Swiss-Prot record:
Residues 59-79 are annotated as: Interaction with PPIL1. Residues 174-339 are annotated as: SNW. The modification N-acetylalanine is found at residue 2. It is found in: Nucleus. It holds the Pfam family SKIP_SNW. Residues 472-489, 503-530 have a biased composition (Basic and acidic residues). GO terms for biological process: cellular response to retinoic acid; intrinsic apoptotic signaling pathway in response to DNA damage by p53 class mediator; mRNA splicing, via spliceosome; negative regulation of transcription by RNA polymerase II; positive regulation by host of viral transcription; positive regulation of mRNA splicing, via spliceosome; positive regulation of neurogenesis; positive regulation of transcription by RNA polymerase II. The lineage of its organism: Eukaryota, Metazoa, Chordata, Craniata, Vertebrata. It comes from the Eukaryota. Keywords: Acetylation, Isopeptide bond, mRNA processing, mRNA splicing, Nucleus, Phosphoprotein, Spliceosome, Transcription, Transcription regulation, Ubl conjugation. The gene is SNW1. This is SNW domain-containing protein 1. There is a cross-link at residues 23, 81, 97, 115, 122, 141, 158, 170, 193, 240, 258, 286, 339, 344, 416, 441, 452, 509 (Glycyl lysine isopeptide (Lys-Gly) (interchain with G-Cter in SUMO2)).
Amino acid sequence: MALTSFLPAPTQLSQDQLEAEEKARSQRSRQTSLVSSRREPPPYGYRKGWIPRLLEDFGDGGAFPEIHVAQYPLDMGRKKKMSNALAIQVDAEGKIKYDAIARQGQSKDKVIYSKYTDLVPKEVMNADDPDLQRPDEEAIKEITEKTRVALEKSVSQKVAAAMPVRAADKLAPAQYIRYTPSQQGVAFNSGAKQRVIRMVEMQKDPMEPPRFKINKKIPRGPPSPPAPVMHSPSRKMTVKEQQEWKIPPCISNWKNAKGYTIPLDKRLAADGRGLQTVHINENFAKLAEALYIADRKAREAVEMRAQVERKMAQKEKEKHEEKLREMAQKARERRAGIKTHVEKEDGEARERDEIRHDRRKERQHDRNLSRAAPDKRSKLQRNENRDISEVIALGVPNPRTSNEVQYDQRLFNQSKGMDSGFAGGEDEIYNVYDQAWRGGKDMAQNIYRPSKNLDKDMYGDDLEARIKTNRFVPDKEFSGSDRRQRGREGPVQFEEDPFGLDKFLEEAKQHGGSKRPSDSSRPKEHEHEGKKRRKE
């Protein structure tokens, strides 16, 4: 017994088995059909109520004019349905050519690899095969020349088409055709049996505008062919698979514009509630646990912070109370007259702290100088070592530089005391600056006139010319004005009390600040006269 008798029947058949069964079924149908069934139209006169529908109803003829119905014999005039389905093609062995899908829209000469054997390298059986040899120089030159000519022709056609005016195309050479007419005889074709016709291309006007519209959109070329699938063809789906792939229609729970009556089971199937089981993700539990832990830690942190704040407040309170107790103790000791050595020790400690602070500032200043930029460092060092003298003259060196302590010589060898220097002790008299300070001519020139050497770099050699330039001089002067006078030298000099204002203020102070001194003296005179009269 064969092994196949024990095995169950296969649920799916291969393509070869399906084709074999189809051939056997067709042979059985030919053998069983004894009489050929052929449909023919009814004879003339018996066609009442008969309407031709199929191609067999027309037989070998055309339409029936007595039947007023749209008829399409041999499908002539019928609108054909547009479809991108390909016709099934078979090879020499009768197998379906599936590579037609990849060859769709491609040229017939294009090589498309769509078989499994295309992936397997071929074995070279004969190394001397001329197809496997490299071309020689002549073949390379010939192919190169053909390629160049084809490219030049394509480029020249595109360039000529883009030109608004172009030269007339060269006419093709004349062609001679031997023509034999169908009507032979003396009365036809002047008795000649054959004629030789010369075909010449019609002359074309180069300035003629185009006759046809060519601005239509050119359809896009075919895309790249799909990747070949190297597996067996698809098998027919079973009924179970078809039911599993059946998708229920989209039924809205809110809108029903057409007013259809939709069964409840279809509505629930479209809703999809019963198709999936409710499954709670475990991340919800993780999130809840994490939130609980975070809340507990936050509460613990808040409580700990509150305890620390309470402890700090308690320490501050205790420190404040201790300070108040010390202050009260010091006040009691001071009131009792008890001297302590704490103040002396505190003073010495404070002095040491000040010395430390000054040294720390000096070290910080030195570090800043070392870190500063070169220009800024030189500027700081220059300002640090700058000498401040009595002569306020920029750019003038100080001739008196000595390390000895200098004193004002005017304070020595004075025969009078303190009351002689300031008007006998009168504070209200303002005579401190009654004499000029360093009234020498050289001193005034140095202070109030810039140095020539310093300003020469800025202004050049024409400094004197600029100083002597008469600026802000009116065109017409007042009468009596003389601008040829010699300019002053030195600082501005003021006259001493030209209006007698100081004298007026002294008189006002002597009268005690009263507004009417005459009125205040009158009652005393009257009172004195009255006393004299009483005595008399």
